[in-house]
Structures are given as C-alpha cells and as structure tokens.
Curated annotation (Swiss-Prot):
Record function comment: Converts the free carboxyl group of a malonyl-thioester to its methyl ester by transfer of a methyl group from S-adenosyl-L-methionine (SAM). It allows to synthesize pimeloyl-ACP via the fatty acid synthetic pathway.
GO biological process, one term: methylation
Gene3D superfamilies for this protein: Vaccinia Virus protein VP39
One Pfam family cited in the UniProt record for this chain: Methyltransf_11
InterPro entries recorded: BioC, Methyltransf_11, SAM-dependent_MTases_sf
Entries under CDD domains matching the protein: AdoMet_MTases
Statement: the UniProt record of this protein carries the keyword Transferase: yes
Catalytic reaction list: malonyl-[ACP] + S-adenosyl-L-methionine = malonyl-[ACP] methyl ester + S-adenosyl-L-homocysteine
Group of enzyme by EC: transferase
Record key words, sorted: Biotin biosynthesis, Methyltransferase, S-adenosyl-L-methionine, Transferase
Organism: Pectobacterium atrosepticum (strain SCRI 1043 / ATCC BAA-672) (Erwinia carotovora subsp. atroseptica)
An example molecular function term from Gene Ontology annotations: S-adenosylmethionine-dependent methyltransferase activity
Full protein name: Malonyl-[acyl-carrier protein] O-methyltransferase
Family indicated by similarity: Belongs to the methyltransferase superfamily.
Length: 253
C-alpha cells in the first residue's frame, strides 16, 4: 500500500505536468466552478481562499470582484502558472487536509473540483471550516460515484480492469457535511468527444489520470486505443463521458 505522502506527491506531479495546458482542456472545471458561484449565497467578506486553485481561473474571478484572494494548491507548477497570470494576492503551496493557515482567517472558502483528491473528505471540510470566520461560507464542488462510468465500462469490456478513479457515493459526501449547517445538490454533466483519443487527452490535460490505488493508466498503443474505442458506448455520434457533480455550501456558525 502506498503512503499518503507518496499519493499526494504523485497527484501534485500529475497536475503539475498539466499546468501549461490545463485551461485548454478545463471545460468541466469552468462549468462546475460557475455553477458553484451561482449556488453560493451573496457574501460581502473580503478574504477569500481558493482551495485547490489550479491555474487560478476562479482566483482571478474573485480578485476582479474586489476580494483579497489566497490561492492554494498542492502543485507548485500550478501555483507558478497562477502567479504568472496575476490571479491572486497571495500564493500558498499546501494540502487542503492540513491547511497552513490560522483559525478564522478567511470569510469565504471556495473549492472547485479539488476535494475529491483528498484522502479524507471529513478532514478536508473540517480544515476549511476551521479557517473560516463565523458568519462565513464554504462552497465546494466535487465528483461523486458514477463519474467516468462510460470509460470504466469500456475498460471492463476490454480487459476486465478498473482503470478509472472511484469517487465517493453521495451518501458519504452528505455524511461528511452532517456536522455543519449545509445544503447539497447533485447534477450530471456529460461531455461529448469526437473520438476516444480526444476523450483521454481531456483527462490527461486536466491532470486527472492519477488513480487513487497508485496505478497510472499508462500509454495506449494505437491498437489498444482502437480496441478501447470498439468497446466504448457511443451517443449522438460521439463518445460521452459523464460526471456526477456534487455542490456543497456550508455555513460557518
């Protein structure tokens, strides 16, 4: 079994390799991030933490809205890219499950598609709650069980292997939120690709080819890709990849 530190290092490296091309492939991240913003209650607080900021796309949104933004990410390469874009006011390399921040130091915690990579969702939410001031708000978007189901089915048909990440069921995400006043919403988002190669590139382009079990999918030969394509379900003339998105808003009492 791989250690937690090794897992976190591998995840950071996977996203670090994607830093330069992340925004070109990050349609899902933008869609979920904008939806999360729409679900958040209005809040006048000035201090914002973008937890798992990636390239800083939404850090920039908050900064342009007049907030003082701390961009935090596990990947030094992602942070460097965000810094180049002048996305935030402050940049922190760190782990959501062990935030290098004082208690009650921000008004808003915003985390778009990051906590699914954490080892313990309750610990991650507890840390975000800890650093948020009373009266503040924590908003997160994450992936739930059933995400990448078409790709998972294709691999199962091809060779019987599990080559996609497993995500938490909605019930487990809900249980992690129970200590707090909160509300959750689950929605399905489907991305359609012209071929399986483009689909796989989209995952690699956003750094999401890391597997929780410590395995990596490896390179696909042309023959292997053709075989996977033959096993992949088609829809509307394309290759679908669905995501089960869970949006959560927690109120800091």
């Amino acid at each position: 079994m791989l250690t937690e530190n090794y897992n976190k290092q591998a995840i950071a490296q996977a996203f670090g390799r994607a830093a330069g091309c992340y925004d070109r492939f990050a349609e899902l991240q933008r869609t979920s991030g904008e939806r999360l913003l729409a679900l958040m209650p209005a809040h006048s607080g000035l201090q914002v933490l973008d937890a798992g900021c990636g390239t800083g796309h939404f850090s920039r949104y908050w900064r342009q809205a007049g907030r003082n933004v701390t961009a935090l990410d596990l990947s030094a390469e992602m942070l460097a890219y965000a810094r180049e874009q002048h996305a935030a006011d402050r940049y922190l390399e760190g782990d959501i499950e062990n935030l290098p921040l004082a208690d009650s130091c921000v008004d808003i915690c915003y985390s778009n598609l990051a906590v699914q990579w954490c080892d313990s969702l309750p610990r991650a939410l507890g840390e975000l709650y800890r650093i948020t001031r009373p009266g503040g708000v924590i908003a997160f978007a994450t992936l739930a069980d059933g995400s990448l189901s078409e790709l998972s089915q294709a691999w199962q048909r091809l060779d019987g292997t599990q080559r996609t990440n497993r995500f938490l069921p909605h019930s487990v995400i809900d249980a992690a939120c129970q200590p707090y006043r909160h509300h959750l919403l689950q929605e399905r988002e489907v991305c359609l690709f012209p071929d399986v190669l483009a689909l796989m590139k989209s995952l690699k382009g956003i750094g999401a080819t890391w597997l929780h079990e410590g395995r990596t999918p490896g390179l696909l030969s042309r023959a292997r890709l053709a075989a996977l394509s033959a096993c992949y379900p088609q829809e509307q003339g394309g290759y679908p990849l669905s995501y089960q998105l869970v949006y959560g808003v927690i109120y800091r009492d």
